[in-house]
Amino acid sequence: MENQPKLNSTKEVIAFLAERFPLCFSAEGEARPLKIGIFQDLVERVQGEMSLSKTQLRSALRLYTSSWRYLYGIKAGAIRVDLDGNACGQLDEQHVEHARKQLEEAKARVQAQREQHQAKKREAGEATAPRRPRKPARKPAAEGEQSRSVSGKPSRPQAARPASAPRAESRVEQRKPVTDTTALQVGQSIKVTAGKNAMDATILEISKDGVRVQLASGLAMIVRAEHLQF
């Protein structure tokens, strides 16, 4: 008996009871309603086994009978069972209603926790940089649109467009997308693509989550490598 293994957690105790009394307890699936006063039966039947104490048995019963799968089994017409699976009377309406309220409260708590977790994730997401990459091929068109908006005549200067296009292309060709952040250095000047524009920025920090840069406007943000160009 001195070398008998001990059950350290409440879940281990429940697993032991399911193995010891399979017609009464279950480790998974819908659980059967237990006989009223089954705690005393447990004390008498398993006293000394696996060095279990009354406190451990009481905690295991409390966890077992408050689980969702047990509460689902508490319904009208269900029969209580003893340790050997023998019928010990039908559930009354009071116990069924009590179990229903317990289940509703448990679900409400889980839903509230889930909504709180999602709210925290949304708050954290608002602090991150834009994550919608744009195709590089659209950048020259964006620069052309800017030049037309400055002139105020988007359709008439047709002859000037072929001359300005090579200059835009040459500027794009001079930039190279960043494929390896190890080639970057703190303090290095860099281009940040956001939407259809490329903005000047300075590298503040390089980490596994991205590159922290400061724009010419003074705004600091974390961006991913695909939004950076030399």
Curated annotation (Swiss-Prot):
Keywords: Chaperone, Cytoplasm, RNA-binding. Residues 154-167 have a biased composition (Low complexity). Residues 105-125, 168-178 have a biased composition (Basic and acidic residues). GO terms for molecular function: RNA strand annealing activity; RNA strand-exchange activity. It comes from the Bacteria. GO terms for biological process: post-transcriptional regulation of gene expression. It is found in: Cytoplasm. Residues 105-182 are annotated as: Disordered. Its main location: cytoplasm. GO terms for cellular component: cytosol. RNA chaperone with significant RNA binding, RNA strand exchange and RNA duplexing activities. May regulate ProP activity through an RNA-based, post-transcriptional mechanism. NCBIfam families: PRK04950.1 (NF003434). This is RNA chaperone ProQ.
